[in-house]
């Protein structure tokens, strides 16, 4: 057991030598009301401070009781600056005889991954090409302008309306990928400028909330495809995913829906409804319930601009229908792209793997091409993006060969597939999970 375990959070007066702890004790502090974590062998009590964590209390809580060094380094740009917030939370360090990593984390893989990140830094792969992002923003604004021009010049017949809807859905999808860049702090050196532009892109160009996205998306990056930690696999009993969940549902005789047909009803309620029905409602309610008035103001500016532009063409009701049709189209694009990298991979309880292994277990890539890069917002390089979330996306292909080499060295599978195959695999994965559920439901 550790020594000095009663020392409170935020203590500024410490006796020498610093209290030491064993992993056995640290791992007990993994509750919502009792959170310790380890960074660079230092032990921190983040119980109270997690409520003030800019990235949200959940993401920091997902690493309670374990080493969070690589996650800490992956998410933050200025380690010296954020390190100042950790100092008052320091309560001790690992005992000298304790390994730096806990449980299923590989020290050799971790050492090699950190060397790889240093190589990426030496290659200037975290340096931004600002012209690239300017052109991305510009082509979004051009599409927004083109949509207005089409209706102004050709009128509001069915064909101009459909063409305009597809143009605006494309603009929304591309704005979604662009806000993702700023949300990950991968454009500017200073976090503040990333945050400011992020609010503009996700708020004014899309009508969504930066804080809602941050709190949700960083959990996904911290613990991808981990039940009870990754919100992206929280399916609200609509789907059963992976192998563990369908077996659990089957054994417990849970049948909220006929999951053996989920690969069929996915087409009806997955891609069509996620954004217009679920996300749109959840985002608005989250901003109101959390009194996030800044994000709400940005979102309102989007809706004001949209209705000011399109009510003269369609009237109030028509503009509302037009908006939701655009969301409907965008939702298909968003769901297929975001699920092709993760849904087909391992989805399970937390095995407490090291950063590199955990990201590779939950992530696969899609082959590179100019279209695939544009269509997916470079999320076809999802493996590299998950390993280095602050790396500008135009550099992800440059680090990919080195990631492949590291995978080969340690016998870790690096999955990369054609775009069509990746999309088909989504349906195949749902079908497989549904069959596992049915077998367990009937026979176990």
Swiss-Prot record:
Q: In which tissues is it expressed?
A: Highly expressed in the adrenal gland, liver, brain, and testis, tissues where lipogenesis and steroidogenesis are active. Also detected in lung, heart, and skeletal muscle.
Its catalytic activity? (9Z,12Z)-octadecadienoyl-CoA + 2 Fe(II)-[cytochrome b5] + O2 + 2 H(+) = (6Z,9Z,12Z)-octadecatrienoyl-CoA + 2 Fe(III)-[cytochrome b5] + 2 H2O; (9Z,12Z,15Z)-octadecatrienoyl-CoA + 2 Fe(II)-[cytochrome b5] + O2 + 2 H(+) = (6Z,9Z,12Z,15Z)-octadecatetraenoyl-CoA + 2 Fe(III)-[cytochrome b5] + 2 H2O; (9Z,12Z,15Z,18Z,21Z)-tetracosapentaenoyl-CoA + 2 Fe(II)-[cytochrome b5] + O2 + 2 H(+) = (6Z,9Z,12Z,15Z,18Z,21Z)-tetracosahexaenoyl-CoA + 2 Fe(III)-[cytochrome b5] + 2 H2O; (11E)-octadecenoyl-CoA + 2 Fe(II)-[cytochrome b5] + O2 + 2 H(+) = (6Z,11E)-octadecadienoyl-CoA + 2 Fe(III)-[cytochrome b5] + 2 H2O
GO biological process: one example: long-chain fatty acid biosynthetic process
- Tell me, in one coarse class, where this protein mainly resides: endoplasmic reticulum
Q: Sorted alphabetically, which InterPro entries does this protein's record hold? A: Cyt_B5-like_heme/steroid-bd (IPR001199), Cyt_B5-like_heme/steroid_sf (IPR036400), FA_desaturase_dom (IPR005804), Fatty_acid_desaturase (IPR012171)
Q: Which residues lie on this side of the membrane: Lumenal?
A: 152, 286-305
Place the motif Histidine box-1 on the sequence: 180-184
Motif extent (Histidine box-2): 217-221
Q: What would be one Pfam family of this protein?
A: FA_desaturase
Provide the induction entry: Induced by dietary PUFA-deficient diet. Induced by a fat-free diet and by a diet containing triolein (18:1n-9) as the only fat source. Down-regulated in liver by dietary PUFA.
Membrane topology reported for the UniProt record = Multi-pass membrane protein
Instruction: Place the motif Histidine box-3 on the sequence.
Output: 382-386
**Disordered, as annotated region:** 1-21
Cytoplasmic-side positions: 1-130, 174-264, 327-444
Cytochrome b5 heme-binding domain: residues covered: 18-95
**Disulfide bond annotation, renumbered to this chain:** none
One GO MF term, please? acyl-CoA desaturase activity
Q: Name one GO cellular component term.
A: membrane
Q: What does this protein do?
A: Involved in the biosynthesis of highly unsaturated fatty acids (HUFA) from the essential polyunsaturated fatty acids (PUFA) linoleic acid (LA) (18:2n-6) and alpha-linolenic acid (ALA) (18:3n-3) precursors, acting as a fatty acyl-coenzyme A (CoA) desaturase that introduces a cis double bond at carbon 6 of the fatty acyl chain. Catalyzes the first and rate limiting step in this pathway which is the desaturation of LA (18:2n-6) and ALA (18:3n-3) into gamma-linoleate (GLA) (18:3n-6) and stearidonate (18:4n-3), respectively.
The record's family statement is: Belongs to the fatty acid desaturase type 1 family.
Report the domain remarks: The protein sequence includes a number of characteristic features of microsomal fatty acid desaturases including the three histidine boxes HXXXH, HXXHH, and QXXHH (these domains may contain the active site and/or be involved in metal ion binding), and the N-terminal cytochrome b5 domain containing the heme-binding motif, HPGG, similar to that of other fatty acid desaturases.
From the Swiss-Prot or TrEMBL record, give the protein name: Acyl-CoA 6-desaturase
* Designated gene of the protein: Fads2
């Amino acid at each position: 057991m550790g020594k000095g375990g009663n020392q409170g959070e935020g203590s500024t007066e410490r006796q020498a030598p610093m209290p030491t702890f064993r992993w056995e004790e640290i791992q007990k502090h993994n509750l919502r009301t009792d959170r310790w974590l380890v960074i660079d062998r230092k032990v921190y009590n983040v119980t109270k401070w997690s409520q003030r964590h800019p990235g949200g209390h959940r993401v920091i809580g997902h690493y309670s009781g374990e080493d969070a060094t690589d996650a800490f380094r992956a998410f933050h740009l200025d380690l010296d600056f954020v390190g100042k917030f950790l100092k008052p939370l320091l309560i001790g360090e690992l005992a000298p005889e304790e390994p730096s990593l806990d449980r299923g984390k590989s020290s050799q893989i971790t050492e090699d991954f950190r060397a790889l990140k240093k190589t990426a830094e030496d290659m200037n792969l975290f340096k931004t090409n600002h012209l690239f992002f300017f052109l991305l923003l510009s082509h979004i604004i051009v599409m927004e302008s083109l949509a207005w021009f089409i209706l102004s010049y050709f009128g509001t017949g069915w064909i101009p309306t459909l063409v305009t809807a597809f143009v605006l859905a494309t603009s929304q999808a591309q704005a979604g990928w662009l806000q993702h860049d700023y949300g990950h702090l991968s454009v500017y050196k200073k976090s503040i400028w990333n945050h400011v532009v992020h609010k503009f892109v996700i708020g004014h160009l899309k009508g969504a909330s930066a804080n809602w996205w941050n709190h949700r998306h960083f959990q996904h990056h911290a613990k991808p495809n981990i039940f009870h930690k990754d919100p992206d696999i929280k399916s609200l009993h609509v789907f059963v995913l992976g192998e563990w969940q369908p077996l659990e549902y089957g054994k417990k005789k849970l049948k909220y829906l006929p999951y053996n047909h989920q690969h069929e009803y996915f087409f009806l309620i997955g891609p069509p409804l996620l954004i217009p029905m679920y996300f749109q409602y959840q985002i608005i309610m989250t901003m109101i319930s959390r009194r996030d008035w800044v994000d709400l103001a940005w979102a309102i500016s989007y809706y004001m601009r949209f209705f000011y532009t399109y009510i003269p063409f369609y009237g109030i009701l028509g503009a509302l229908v037009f908006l939701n049709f655009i969301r409907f189209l965008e939702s298909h694009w968003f769901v297929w792209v975001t699920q092709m990298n993760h849904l087909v991979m391992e989805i399970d309880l937390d095995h407490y793997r090291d950063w590199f292994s955990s990201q590779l277990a939950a992530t696969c890539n899609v082959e590179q091409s100019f279209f695939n890069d544009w269509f997916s917002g470079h999320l076809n390089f999802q493996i590299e993006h998950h390993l280095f979330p602050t790396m500008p996306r135009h550099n992800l292909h440059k680090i990919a060969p080195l990631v492949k080499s590291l995978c080969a060295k340690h016998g870790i599978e690096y999955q990369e597939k054609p775009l069509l195959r990746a999309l088909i695999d989504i349906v195949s994965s749902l079908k497989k999970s549904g069959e596992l559920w049915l077998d367990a439901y009937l026979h176990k």
